Curated annotation (Swiss-Prot):
Family: Belongs to the GTP cyclohydrolase I family. QueF type 2 subfamily.
Pfam families reported for this sequence: QueF, QueF_N
Name assigned to this protein: NADPH-dependent 7-cyano-7-deazaguanine reductase
Organism listed in the record: Rickettsia canadensis (strain McKiel)
Gene name of this polypeptide: queF
Matches recorded under InterPro entries: GTP-CH-I_C/QueF (IPR043133), NADPH_dep_7-cyano-7-deazaG_red (IPR050084), QueF (IPR029500), QueF_N (IPR029139), QueF_type2 (IPR016428)
EC number: 1.7.1.13
């Protein structure tokens, strides 16, 4: 179905009964074709981490239960899930009776796997689980004294480098783009690890800021940034991790890496989550 058929930007009615058909799929291939990415031979590995904070159901006695969930959608999935449809889907469990939280987890993982055409993993946690806040790893580049005048479209010509090999990790809290359909802001913290020609931090920060008024889904922004860096410096190693702020009870955190045997970064919430 075309993106115009989704519920994004439209008035919606919350279903009072569980309904897996609420999940709306978006093919990854459309954006990847634009970026020159071969979906049959991806230049990266990774996942999209979805953290959900509005999750509830009823136990067999009719008593409500609330929790949080974390779900991992692999980058080789055929589709992503449109976030508003996922919110409506999760809320369709509000009056749904389950025998156990394990049953709820199984249902959600199966539904997500069906719509994305991939093996989705994840876990649901009780609401009283202790969660610690974290800090983005690496050197923050936000305090650099730069002059900016490009806020759209993203300009990969701004990525400059020095002809010296380094291994470093940098981060920025200044990444912002807008939802492709609604124009709502997506605020993100990005962490980049790489080994290769040294990125000039001032020009790279300008590049990140050039996304500021750009309309694109979060997962697609991540792959655009990864592709632009990879094409610019051809690093021996590269990974990017973007932690987006919560909207509609959900935050999305894409991770991409050149390393097939990658280790996922800590999924600790940052201060803006």
């Amino acid at each position: 179905m075309p993106l115009s058929a989704s519920l994004l930007g439209k008035n919606s009615t919350y279903k009072d009964s569980y309904d897996a058909t609420l999940l709306f799929k978006i093919p990854r291939i459309n954006n990847r074709n634009e970026l020159g990415i071969n979906s049959n031979n991806l230049p990266f590995y990774g996942v999209d981490i979805w953290n959900t904070y509005e999750l509830s159901c009823l136990n067999k006695n009719g008593k409500p239960w609330v929790g949080v969930g974390t779900f991992y959608i692999p980058t080789d999935s055929e589709n992503i899930v449109e976030s508003k449809s996922f919110k409506l889907y999760l809320n369709s469990f509000n009056n749904f009776v389950v025998e156990s939280i394990e049953e709820l987890e199984r249902i959600i993982l199966q539904d997500l796997s069906n719509v994305t055409h991939a093996k989705v993993t994840g876990q649901i946690f009780p609401i009283n689980t202790k969660i610690e806040f974290g800090l983005p790893s690496g050197k923050n580049i936000d305090d650099l004294n730069i002059e900016c005048n490009n806020y759209c479209p993203p300009d990969n010509s701004l990525i400059e480098y020095e002809d010296v090999l380094v291994e470093e990790e940098i981060n920025s809290n200044l990444l912002k783009s807008n939802c492709l359909v609604t124009g709502q802001p997506d605020w993100g913290t990005i962490v980049i690890k790489y080994r290769g020609k040294k990125l000039k931090h001032d020009s790279f920060l300008k590049y990140l800021i050039s996304f500021r008024n750009y309309n694109e889904f979060a997962e697609q922004c991540a792959e655009r940034i990864f592709t632009d860096i990879n094409n610019s410096i051809n690093p021996d190693f590269l990974s990017i991790y973007i932690v987006y702020t919560r909207r509609g009870g959900i935050d999305i955190c894409p991770y991409r890496s050149l390393d097939q045997n990658y280790n996922l970064p800590s999924n600790k919430r940052l201060i803006r989550q």
